[in-house]
């Protein structure tokens, strides 16, 4: 269950809270120990990859409080569970006390999930389906009540069942190839990616940003594709797989926004920017550590940063690459706003050889920005955008007195 979704931890936790006597059961503890043993490969994978799942959910997804995220939470839950269904379940829970231990657990599962993710909405967007685990206790409660309460049974037959039929009809409708459905992004994707394939040929296709496009390209064409993440997007499983390593210094088709060498390819179904390169270069795996003593700045202040840059690749990184030049920048992030600050290097880096580590000092000037806390880091910027190469620390920018 945990292998499928981490929300399973909540299912287990709420079950224990509703049935504390489980903690006295030897069989309960044996089952828990056995489950942990089964999870050892997953824990090892997390450790080996710097806990990407936890980093993604606990750090990367955290957007801070946004009223919109809070206001959309309950409407999204109504849409997921069907307002008529969850409305009936809530009515049953308020009108009837749980009749036994099993029903008490069902009640707590439903209430626990809804309340827990309501509070999560204070720190960012909650995907509507995250609470789907409580649909099982919801259905069980409603089914049990239909057996004993004729009013609930009539309500279910009159209102809930027709909505289920509408849902099934809508699902069938989305499987059709109607043009209107294709424009809603429910289908018709194969032709788009086939046209992209006709331009790329047998070259691997390199996308920027999210994982969806390379995944669909590989699915529909059976050919290789990869996503290169940047600070403008979240990291994906492609950052763990690191397929791009085998494409470096080799020909590839780069599918990114129309900048520099990109040409615009357009047809009736798709429009995209891209170009062929005979030598791909990416820098996402370059590691940068740095030391900054001052963490309180005003606009116009000079910042001096000592850094160490390591190239873990088995090939050189050319900062003056003809297609993918690289620049070292300071990055300042506040909310969704990202600012790249140009730097001056005491000893300009033009090449980092395979496995090499270089060090130096950079100087920059804090730009005129709004007062507040910013995340500070160093990044290598190239055609795919600024990459995640260093840790980020908090600094404060204050207005001049």
What function would you assign to each model-found segment?
Residues 11-102, 115:
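Transmembrane-lumen/periplasm boundary regions of multi-pass, lipid-linked membrane glycan transferases
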Residues 124-151:
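Hydrophobic/aromatic-rich transmembrane helices and adjacent perimembrane loops
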Residues 2, 108-127:
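Transmembrane-helix signature of polytopic, lipid-linked glycan biosynthesis machinery
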Residues 340-385:
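Short, solvent-exposed, Trp/other aromatic-anchored flexible loops in extracytoplasmic proteins
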Residues 199-235, 319-333, 346, 377-379, ...:
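Short periplasmic/luminal acceptor-recognition loop of GT-C membrane glycosyltransferases, typified by
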Residues 239-285, 308, 368-371:
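Periplasmic/luminal catalytic loop of GT-C fold multi-pass membrane glycosyltransferases
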Residues 128, 153-202, 210-231, 255, ...:
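Membrane-proximal, lumen/periplasm-facing interface regions of secretory-pathway glyco-
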Residues 309-320:
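Short amphipathic, basic-aromatic surface patches that mediate peripheral association
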């Amino acid at each position: 269950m945990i292998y499928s979704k981490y929300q399973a931890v909540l299912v287990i936790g709420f079950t224990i809270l509703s049935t504390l006597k489980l903690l006295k059961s030897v069989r309960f503890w044996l089952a828990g120990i056995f489950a942990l043993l089964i999870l050892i490969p997953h824990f090892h994978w997390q450790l080996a990859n710097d806990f990407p799942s936890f980093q993604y959910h606990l750090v990367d997804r955290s957007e801070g409080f946004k009223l919109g995220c809070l206001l959309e939470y309950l409407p999204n839950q109504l849409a997921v569970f069907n307002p008529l269904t969850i409305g009936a379940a809530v009515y049953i829970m308020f009108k009837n006390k749980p009749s036994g231990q099993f029903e008490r657990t069902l009640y707590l599962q439903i209430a626990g999930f809804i309340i827990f993710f309501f509070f999560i909405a204070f720190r960012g967007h909650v995907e509507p389906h995250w609470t789907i685990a409580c649909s099982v206790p919801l259905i069980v409660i409603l089914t049990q009540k239909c057996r004993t309460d004729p009013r609930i049974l009539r309500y279910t037959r009159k209102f809930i069942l027709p909505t289920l039929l509408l849902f099934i009809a809508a699902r069938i409708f989305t499987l059709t190839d109607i043009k209107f459905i294709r424009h809603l992004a429910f289908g018709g994707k194969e032709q788009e990616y086939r046209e992209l394939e006709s331009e790329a040929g047998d070259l691997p296709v390199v996308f920027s940003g999210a994982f969806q496009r390379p995944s669909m390209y590989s699915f529909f064409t059976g050919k290789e594709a990869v996503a290169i993440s940047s600070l403008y997007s979240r990291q994906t499983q492609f950052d763990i797989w690191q397929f791009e390593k085998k494409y470096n210094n080799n020909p590839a088709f780069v599918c990114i926004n129309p900048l520099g060498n990109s040409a615009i390819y357009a047809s009736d179904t798709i429009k995209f920017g891209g170009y062929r390169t005979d030598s791909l270069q990416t820098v996402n795996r370059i590691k940068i550590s740095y030391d900054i003593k001052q963490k309180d700045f005003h606009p116009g202040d000079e910042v001096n940063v000592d850094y160490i840059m390591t190239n873990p690749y088995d090939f050189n990184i050319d900062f003056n690459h003809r297609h993918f030049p690289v620049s070292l920048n300071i990055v300042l992030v506040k909310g969704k706003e990202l600012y790249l600050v140009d730097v001056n290097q005491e000893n300009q880096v033009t090449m980092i050889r395979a496995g090499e580590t270089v060090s130096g000092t950079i100087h920059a000037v804090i730009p005129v920005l709004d007062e507040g806390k910013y995340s500070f880091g160093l990044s290598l910027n190239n055609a795919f955008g600024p990459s995640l190469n260093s840790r980020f620390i908090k600094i404060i920018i204050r207005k001049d007195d």
